[in-house]
Amino acid sequence: MRDTMEILRTENIVKYFGEFKALDGVSISVNKGDVTLIIGPNGSGKSTLINVITGFLKADEGRVYFENKDITNKEPAELYHYGIVRTFQTPQPLKEMTVLENLLIGEINPGESPLNSLFYKKWIPKEEEMVEKAFKILEFLKLSHLYDRKAGELSGGQMKLVEIGRALMTNPKMIVMDEPIAGVAPGLAHDIFNHVLELKAKGITFLIIEHRLDIVLNYIDHLYVMFNGQIIAEGRGEEEIKNVLSDPKVVEIYIGE
């Protein structure tokens, strides 16, 4: 019987780049309100998998389901309407615009990078309700004092928080995050994951790729390990996750990296 808490699942996802099989029958399940982490060496297929899930790549075989609806190969902008949003390893703020404007721009072309919003200067919404919502999100992220700062003047970690803020403007059910603390100082990295836990408590689900296990392990509920385009290990809960990370085959691929 399928887990009634499941919000996302993939079934036997296959993705080719030419003759190279980047994903080889990948099946995962993500429960509602969980923080699920995918790890693996570079080139193991992690980014390809989340690109398929979020519509930035098309699967060659297999299906993706969200809340039991088939969302396979839908465009990112379509997935916004299902409540799925994505943050990127390299933040993509509009650097000439303020922090506040960057949050408001997400309401124009939801599900797309703001860099694709050709008419953003003309169409930035100024309705009081949207501005109030943006300020509440900035306060939550401890960025309200920077609301009028140009995004190009922010630190890398602050830009990552702006990415999260833009995602929150869409009232997401699930946020898919690609290395949210890459290159971020440890203190701010913990701040970011503390925000993740606060959002989890509000019912938001997270699917995350991240290499910095020393920081993230205390924040996750579910772990998948990928290698050569396949899931090679899985653990749910603290004890199972510890067992996975001490598994000789998992240790070997990380030592070999």
Curated annotation (Swiss-Prot):
Which parts of the sequence belong to the ABC transporter domain? Answer: 8-253
- Asked if the keyword Transport belongs to this entry, the reply reads yes
Q: Name one GO molecular function term.
A: ATP hydrolysis activity
Q: Which InterPro entries match?
A: AAA+_ATPase, ABC_AA/LPS_Transport, ABC_transporter-like_ATP-bd, ABC_transporter-like_CS, P-loop_NTPase
A GO term (biological process) for this protein? amino acid transport
Q: Where does ATP bind?
A: 40-47
Q: GO CC: one term?
A: plasma membrane
- Which cysteine pairs are joined by S-S bonds? none
Keywords in alphabetical order? Amino-acid transport, ATP-binding, Nucleotide-binding, Transport
Q: Name one Pfam family in it.
A: ABC_tran
Q: Which Gene3D superfamilies match?
A: P-loop containing nucleotide triphosphate hydrolases (3.40.50.300)
Tell me the function of this protein.
Probable component of a branched-chain amino-acid transport system.
Q: Which family does it belong to?
A: Belongs to the ABC transporter superfamily.
Q: What does the subunit comment say?
A: Monomer.
Q: What is this protein called?
A: Probable branched-chain amino acid transport ATP-binding protein LivG
Organism, scientific name: Methanocaldococcus jannaschii (strain ATCC 43067 / DSM 2661 / JAL-1 / JCM 10045 / NBRC 100440)
- Its gene is livG
